[in-house]
Amino acid sequence: MGIARILSAVLFLSVLFVVTFPTLLSADHHDGRIDTCRLPSDRGRCKASFERWYFNGTTCTKFVYGGYGGNDNRFPTEKARMKRCAKA
């Protein structure tokens, strides 16, 4: 019975890998990581007010960052955003 469970687990994990692997190769990934410049703006979880810049798909836009959490589509200056997302 123990070998059957192990084989079932291996089969399940193999199928899961085959199903999710194409997502890792999608257009939103670059060199194995999610393309930062395609992420939506995310204020984060705190209530601070830091002016930051993000790329909204077509232009560089200001938003208020709360100081904690959020995602990596957040830059301290427009110039820093342009340097990272120039090819987006």
Swiss-Prot record:
Transmembrane segments: none annotated. Its main location: secreted. Keywords: Disulfide bond, Protease inhibitor, Secreted, Serine protease inhibitor, Signal. One of its GO terms (cellular component) is extracellular region. It comes from the Eukaryota. GO terms for molecular function: potassium channel regulator activity; serine-type endopeptidase inhibitor activity; toxin activity. Serine protease inhibitor that inhibits trypsin at a molar ratio of 1:1. This is Kunitz-type U15-theraphotoxin-Hhn1o. It comes from Cyriopagopus hainanus.
